[in-house]
Amino acid sequence: VVAVDGVSPVSFNLASGSYNVALRHRNHLGAMTTSSVALSSSSTAVDLSSAGTSTFGTSARKTITGTFPTQALWAGDVTFNGQVKYTGSGNDRDPILTTVGSTTPNNTVSIYSTRDVNLNGQVKYTGSANDRDPILVNVGSTTPNNIRQAQLP
């Protein structure tokens, strides 16, 4: 994670000390370090993508396997309420349909939005690379009624 210029380190206007570091992103559930991290005026690396970095809660990050295994934030919190939910009231799937036009689910909208779950610059409800499927996968494809909760205090 870098500052909004894309290269500079993130800085906080805080006194030097030990802090738990938490990270949230547009439509992802946040993750936080279990242990406090010493922060000061010099840069400190906190690698939440590393399986070796312990996080608060249970299954706070998604394990990505394959050629480049890593840990990632859970995508799909379209409603920004601290949960990823595929079915039922207040789910994260319906706002995607609303964005593309409820009566035209095949539409694609190019926009910066919390409803762009796969972060490709488009909101898409059906077809390949749609924003609905990652929500289903992240709650459990065979258990669409599950709800994935943020693991932040």
Name the predicted role of every residue range.
Residues 1-153:
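Cellulosome-associated attachment modules in secreted, modular CAZymes
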